[in-house]
C-alpha cells in the first residue's frame, strides 16, 4: 500500500502551500525578501497559468490582505484569468487585527465558498508587511471550520511556517496575545448565546493594579489612563474616539509607590464594543509621558535613541503629495465640539513595516522595540514596569488579555518583583458585576526588547513620547502647558515648538506609513500680558517650498496683527483663494486642532531629537502640535527670505488681503501655476522695474479675490503646460476700452501695512510687492496732475532682476519698435492680471494676449462699485461703451449717468516687433447711451482700427462674437447669387473623384472630348426635375386650424406622463369604453398580459383623480390621457380589478410551470434512490478510497461525503496521464462493465440541476397571495352595484377553479420538499448543510466527469491496440527477415 500511496501522491500546485483541504497560501508570503514589481507579476501569472492548466474545471477565490486603499496589483493580474479576488485590509490603524465585524464577514464568506463544492479553491495572499494578519485569519478560519480547537497551537503552527525574523520585521510589537484573545471569540461561537457578540453599552467603573512598577528609580509611578473606542452615546458613528482621559493637572493624578499593595483608580467611563485601555506614566512636570507596557520580556522602557537623524538622507516632499495634503484639508469632517471627547486628541501608535523605517525615524515610539539594547538609555532603567490592556466588553462576559513585565536582569538595582495578576472591574450602567481575574498570557518573542501591546479590533493605541530631549528643527517631544491652556491640552501627547532667534536647521518630516496628514505651526506670545499671537518663524533654510506649491491654511487661536503692527509676511492670492473654504466657518481658536477626526488626529507623535543649536522654550509657553502628513516623504522647504507657511484667518479681525501687484509687461504674461506646472512667455524676460514708490491703496475684500481668481484665469490658461513645452501662441485680440464708472468722490488711500520682503520669483511663491495707488480720477473742471513718464520698454535680451522692487503704475509700454503719439497714462491693469503676474516662473514663455484695461475681469465686474474712488478717468469725453468681462460670465454694472471713459489702449503684438508702425487714435466720437444692466448688450468685436472716427470698440471672447465677426466679413457681404436658384432633385450616384489612366473618365477629361458634351438647358431641367416647393400661404392656412385645435386642448396631467399614456393607447387600438368593458368582463382574448400591465402602470393616482374631479370645463376639450383617466375613474377600484385580470391571465401558465418543476424534483429523487448501478459505483469508490487511506485516520470508512466524488479527478498518477477517476472507470470496465451506463438511469438529473427551491417557494407564495387577493376583491365587488355584476360573476367562476388548482399545487409542493430532503439523507448529508441544489449539481458533475474519463480510457485502449498491432507487424517483419538471413549460405 505504500507504493500505491506514493503512486497517487497529491502534490500542491506550484507556488502555493497547502494549509488544509482546498485552502492554499502563496508561498512567497512566507519569504523575507520583497519581490520587485515585474518579478512579482511574472510569478503570479505563472501560478495562475499552472492552476488553469491542471485545474481547468475548478473555481478559485483569492483573499488578499493589503495596505492599499485602491485595488491591489494581484487583483488586476488574477482578474484577467477569471479568478475572484477579494481585497481586505491588512491592518486596522497599524494593528495586525481586524474588527470583529470584518473578521466575521471574512469567515462567513470563506465558509460559504468552500461549502459550495470540492472544486472551489480558497487561496490566501498578503502583501508585504501583512503577514501577521494573514496568520491570524488563517488560524481563525481553521478554528471556525472546526478543524482545530486549540487557539495557541493553531497560531503557533502558522507562525512556524515562516522564519521567526519575518514577524519581527513586520510588527514591532508582539501581536500574539491580542490575536489569541480574538481567536477565543471565534472558538466560543458555539458556547455563547449569540455570535458575533453584540456590542452592549457598559460602564468601566475602575481599574485595580495589584503590582506597582518602578519608574526611573523613584519607587513607583504616576499613572494616567486613556480609553479609546466607539462612543456608546452615538450608535450611528462607530469611529473610535477618546472616551476617557485623566486630566494631567488635577488631584486625580498622584504618585503611587511600590509599598502600596493595591491601587484602585476610578474611571466611570461608558464603553461599548472594542475598547483600548491605555496606562501612561506621567513625569514630575505633569507633561512628559512614558507608555506603560505589561510584558513578559526584559524590562526596558520605551526610550528612544537620542542620535540625530541624518538630514541628507531625507528627500523632499513631492508636489503631488502636497496636493494630497491640501485635498485632505478641504474634506475634513470635524467632530462635535460640544462633546467632552473633542477636548482630547488621540494619537495613533505607529508601526513600521521595515527595519529601514525604524532606523530612519527613531522618534516613533512604536518603532523603538526594534532598537538594540546598546541604543537604549539603560541608565534610567530600574526595574520598570508598565501596562496596556485591550477589552472586548459585553454584558455577558469580559475577556481581557495582559502580560506581566519582569525586571531587566542586567540593569536592575532592586530585588526582582514577583509576577502578579491584574484585576479590572467592569460594570454595566447600573448593575456592577464582580471583578474579573485576568490570567497572564506569556509569549516569548526573541530579538525584541519589549513585547506586545494588546491591539483592539475597532480602535488604535495612542503613542506618547517618552524621552525628555531638547527640540530640533520645529518639532519637540513635550512642552509644558501654561495653566490657562491646561484644560484644552490635557489629552495631547506631544507638541511642537518654533525656534526663535536661532539659526534653524532643516525640517525633516518622517516618511512613515502611519503619520498623520496635518501641518500646523503655532508659537506662543513673547510676553505673558498680551494675548497669544501667531509668529511665523523667519526661517531661510528650513521651509523651502517650490514656486508652484500651494500654501496650506489652518485656522488657529490667534489674533491678526492690527494695522499698527505690520505683519511678518503676506500669503499669496492663490493661497487665499484655496483657503476660503477652510477659514470661512472655523473658530479662530487652537481648539480646532483638537477636533480633528481620529483618522487624522490620532497620528503618531513625532519626538524631537537633541540639538545644541536651538534654544528650549520656557515652560510658560503654550505647547503647539506638529502634524506630519501620513505616508508622505520628507519635505525640505527652501527660501532665501522669510516665507509664510500658514495663512491664518480669525474672526476677531479680518485678514488682510494682498495689495495690488505690479502691472503686466507688454510681452510678458505670467499665468497662475498649479502644482509644478510652470507657464510663462517665450519671447522676453521681465523688464526691470522702478524703485519703490508711495504705498498701495486699501486692498479689496478677500472674497473678491477668491471668488474671481479662477474664473478670470480660466480665460487666460486653458490647460496647464508641462515643464519644457512651448504652447501654441494664441492670436492676440485687440484690447477693449475700459468700462465707465461714475466718479463721485475720491478718498486718499489709507496707510498700508508694512510691505512684505521681496522674494525671488524663481524660488518662492509669495506675491510680489504691490504698486503705488493710481492717480485720482479725472473730474470735468478739475486740473489734471502731471503724469510721470512710462518706463522704458524691456529689451528682447534683457534679463530680469532677481528681486523686483515695487514699481510705479506706468501706462502699458509699447511693443519694441512701435511709434506712438503721447497720450495720458491708462488706468492700472485689472486685479486678475495683477494676480496672474504675481506668479513668476522660469520656464519657457508664450506670447500673451494684450493687457486689458482695469475693471475688465470678473474680479472687478462682479463688484464694480468697490473701486469707484480709485479709478482713473480719461481727459477725453467719448461715449461710454457697455461693461464687459473677460470671464465666462458677464456681470453688468449698476446703471449710472454717463461719465467720461478712457480712450482705447494701444494695440500690442499686431505684427513683428521689428516692423515700425504708426497708430493714430481717432477723435472722440459722439456720446452714446449709458451702459445697460444686461449681459446681452455686447456689441460685436471690432477688427480694424482706421483713421475715421468709429464708435468705441468693445468685444467679448465668446463664440457668439466670433460668428458675428464672420458675418461682417467681406465674403458674407456679397450678394447671394445662388439664393434664387430652384432646388433640383438629386441624383444619388457614387461619385468617382479620381479618373484612372485609360478609363472612360480619363478620356472625358481631354479637351476634344469635352467639347462634344451637349449643352444642358438648366431652365428645362428646373421645370422638369425641380423639388416641389409648398405654398407658404396654403401651409399657414392648413396649420392655423391645427394650432387652434391644439390650443383648445386642456392638459392637466404631466406632459411626459401624458405622452407615454397616448403611446400606450395607440398600441392597444381600441376605444376606451370597449377596453374597460373587456376589463370588467375579465376577457383575456382582447388584451394580453403585457397590455394589462401597461394599463396598471397608467392608472390615475389620487392626486390626478382630484385634479380631474376639480375640472369644471368642457371635458371634451381634455387630452386623450385625461379622457382615458376619466374613463378609468368610472370603474370602482380599477387598479385592483386590472391586477386581478393580470393574475387570471398568468395563472394557468404559472401553475403549469410550477407543477413541471415539482414533478422533476420528485422524479430525480426517485431515480437516484432506485438506481442499482449508481449504488454499485458508489460502493466501488468506497473500496478504492479505503485502499488508498489504509493505515491512516481516513481509512476504514463506512461511507464518504458527497462532495468527495469531485476529488477523484484531482488525484493524479505519477505519470500524470491518469487520475483516480480514470482508474475507477478502468476497474469498473474490467470488473463490473454492466454498471458503466449508470447515467442512463438518471435522466432527470440535468433538468433538476436548473431548479432552485428558493424560486419555487417564491412562485408558490405569489400564487397563494394572488388567490387571497382574488377572494378579497370578490367580496368587495359584490357591493359595487349593477356595473360590476358581470365582473363579480366571472370572478366567482374563476376563483372556484383556481382554488382547486391551488390545493393540488400545495400538496405537490409539500411532496417535492420531502423528496428533496430525502435525496440528501440518502447520501448521508444534512439537508440544511447540503441542500438539494448542491446534491444535484455534485451528482451531475460526477456523471459528466465519469463519462469523459471513460471516453478517454476507450481512446487510450484503441491507441494501445493499434500500437500493439504495429509492434506485432514489426516483429513479423523482423522474424521473416531473420529467416531469410538464416537461409542464405
UniProtKB/Swiss-Prot annotation:
One MF term in the entry's GO annotations: phosphoprotein phosphatase activity
InterPro entries: FH2_Formin, FH2_Formin_sf, Formin_homology_domain, Prot-tyrosine_phosphatase-like, Tensin_C2-dom
Domain named Phosphatase tensin-type: residues: 9-193
Compositionally biased intervals (Low complexity): 702-718, 855-867, 933-942
Record's keyword annotation contains Repeat: no
Biased composition range(s): Polar residues: 349-358, 448-470, 483-510
Keywords for the protein's UniProt record, in alphabetical order: Hydrolase, Protein phosphatase
Compositionally biased tracts (Pro residues): 654-665, 689-701, 727-758, 766-795, 802-815, 895-906, 921-932
Family, similarity comment: Belongs to the formin-like family. Class-II subfamily.
Name of the protein in its database record: Formin-like protein 7
Organism: Oryza sativa subsp. japonica
Gene: FH7
